[in-house]
Amino acid sequence: VEELCTLYTRQVGRVICLPYGVRAERVYEGIRLYREEPAADMERESIEVTGEMLSRAEKEEVVLALPDGRLHLRIRDFSGNMQEIPKKTYTKWFDYGKIKSGLRLRRRESGDYLKIDAAGHTKKLKEYFVNEKIPAAKRDAIWLLATGSEILWVAGGRIGAGCKVGENTEKILEVRLSGGNDCEDQEN
């Protein structure tokens, strides 16, 4: 009990081992108790969004199967009306003209970063996760839309400034996640 009380005063992420294979971890909400299980390799799925897929997305919605849901892609003309941009958690618009290289939907990797403003300033993805108080145990499960190491979108969170839609945007790439535990098919 004393160890748990001490753990509560420590920084988030600290873990202590208790008898019978039980672990206690300091999390933002308090202390989480769980049984130690063999380390499971976190799925490192990665889905490349090919040029062929993007060509099809100009004509129709392209739907890709994910282990925990679906990825929907669509490219269309943008009217310039900034009020049209959806305010949904799992639907985001990107300036298609600013996307320079291949897109990939993947989990986090070393060296990932977000552009945080139009001036090109960056923030490490890890720093973003810490600032948003996303538990370390959940970070490997979050989908990211990336071009190289630049993160365009942290699914369920912010988009990077590098491909944000602006008044000069001509075409938009609409990306939507659906069907997973955290994303809803029908967003409000």
Language model features: what each stretch is:
Residues 1-188:
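AMP-forming adenylation/ATP pyrophosphatase catalytic core
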